Amino acid sequence: FQTSIRAEVLEGHVQTSDNVSIAYDVYKASHDEVVILAHGWFMTKNSNAFSQMAEDFSKYYDVIVLDFRGHGKSSGKYTFGSKEVEDIKPIINYAKRNYKKVYLIGFSLGSLISVDYCSKNNNVDKLILVSAPTDFDKIENNVLSPNAFVPTLRKFEYKRWTSIRFSLSALKRNKIKPINEIKNIKIPTLFIAGENDPIIYKWHNSMLYDASISENKQAILIKKGKHAEDLYLEAPQTFIDTCVSWLNKS
């Protein structure tokens, strides 16, 4: 159900199995279901896009948004998906203890981490993947292209950008391949992509959808849409309505 109550925002930290401190915010509005928002690279829980999105989702669910390692108020260095699944484990454990249903929404590299988690665990009720890559190696050369980097610069927030810390050595590690891991996920899954995404081209969405073994799956291509959180920023209420409508289906 929808509520007009403004969410109370509570800050917290959890410790990962490899001793990284992960910062998170809980938007509490007395719902018994929760949405977890998993951001991509160069985003944080306090970036304008995700704080606004969390407020909007909190009309329908409680919301948890975290900073992956090397981002925002979390410690450690970002490893481009190599270790970030450890960041989300204690967040989901917290959610399972406190809510009737847990939904996970991953954006860009956050969707890669979400696929990695859900392929190995069965304690998430529904999964939404926004601008998910089939394979990290298929996107890394697109990130610094003008079409990709200019929209990122438009969202420039000094405090956020200067908080990012990453491990260059992690780029050499074996990376997660969602196209393989999606075959282990049976829960309801929604795949969302932008028609004009300059980083993760729309064919990634189609390939992941086709490879999915979920009996309850749907793929949505947003006309003229761009990348990840931009799909929300370009049409906030439409994006929220799309997600809420799908999550509320039995």
How should these model regions be labeled?
Residues G225-P236:
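Catalytic histidine-centered segment of alpha/beta-hydrolase-like enzymes
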Residues S119-L171:
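Hydrolase active-site cap/lid region
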Residues R69-K96:
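Catalytic nucleophile-loop/oxyanion-hole region of alpha/beta-hydrolase
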Residues F1-Q15, V20-V26:
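An N-terminal hydrophobic leader/cap segment in hydrolases
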Residues A54-S75:
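Conserved alpha/beta-hydrolase
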Residues I185, F191-A193, D197:
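Short beta-strand/loop motif that positions the catalytic acidic residue
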Residues P198-H204:
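Conserved alpha/beta-hydrolase "acid-adjacent" motif
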Residues W41-A54:
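The serine-hydrolase catalytic nucleophile loop
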